[in-house]
């Protein structure tokens, strides 16, 4: 076989392969178009578009509904979700025996506020008669058709209205327009001040001051002061003053004065006057009047009236009425009875009083110390200093006065040196 025959065979095989691929592609397109036509052959083709099948038209419909890990994240697998819900003794603590559980549920005026006394509560629930009688728009065009240019007293108004016409006479087409048809009443197609398709002060499809599909001051689909889908002063899906999904003064998912996920005056995930994750008047993670992570009137991480990390009325890191790092009425870095009453920046323990220097140590006074004064020596070793009463001293020591005195002294010394040098020169000459 020659080279030409080999080339011919290869070209023939290539053409057959390409032809089969083209046929398969056409079959797939025809099948997909047929399925698409079948799926959109309902009465309302837009209704089913992208609802239950992830199609090319609307792939966003199912995106993140059940397959997204963020949807199920922390709902059942997270240990924080089940923490303390049924097994923890804190879960049942104070639910039925604690007076705080029933506090404000029926006796609290906030519970009944606006439920029956609020005029918005009864608005449109049983009848809207008062509004209809008083509202001039209600009777507009119901029993009489008023004409501003042609009052009832004019003869033109009654002309030809009830008189019998002769056999050959014909009325003008404009005469009967709107007299007994549905066009005589406002609204698009309906009657009595309707919305688009309904009746009697409706929304789009409903009745009596409704939302889109419901009744009686509803939300989108519900009834009676609802949210989007719920009933009776609800949130988005719940009932009775709810949050997004819960009930009865809830947070986002919980119940009964909750936070986001918890119950009974909780924080974000906790219970019973909690912080974010804790319980019983907690901070962010702790319990019982805590700070962020601690307990009992804490700071950010500590406990019992703490600062940021310490305990018991602390500063930032210390304890018990501290400064930033120390304790008990300290300065910035000192501890335990440090320089109470005007201490310096770093002063410690029994510093001297009144007019200490900038870096003085040991035997420095307590009050009005300098910037970096430090600990006094032991009581047995320290020397006593005479405290000068500034008010009684006629010439108190100050930095400015000391400087002037030093200048005067130097001037005198310089003058003496000059005089001595002049005397020496005179003797030499």
Curated annotation (Swiss-Prot):
Residues carrying Phenylalanine amide: 237, 245, 253, 261, 269, 277, 293, 301, 309, 325, 333, 346, 359, 372
A Pfam cross-reference name: FARP
Keywords, in A-Z order: Amidation, Cleavage on pair of basic residues, Neuropeptide, Pyrrolidone carboxylic acid, Repeat, Secreted, Signal
GO biological process: neuropeptide signaling pathway
Region (Disordered): 230-429
Biased composition (Basic and acidic residues): 230-371, 392-429
Subcellular location per the Swiss-Prot or TrEMBL entry: Secreted
Propeptide feature: residues: 23-233, 239-241, 247-249, 255-257, 263-265, 271-273, 279-289, 295-297, 303-305, 311-321, 327-329, 335-342, 348-355, 361-368, 374-429
Record bears the keyword Secreted: yes
Keyword Signal: yes
UniProt modified residues of type Pyrrolidone carboxylic acid: 234, 242, 250, 258, 266, 274, 290, 298, 306, 322, 330, 343, 356, 369
Gene Ontology, cellular component aspect: extracellular region
Main location: secreted
Signal peptide: 1-22
PANTHER family (UniProt xref): LEUCINE ZIPPER PROTEIN 4-RELATED
Biological function: Not known but it could act as a transmitter at neuromuscular synapses.
Protein name, entry field: Antho-RFamide neuropeptides type 2
Species for this entry: Anthopleura elegantissima (Green aggregating anemone)
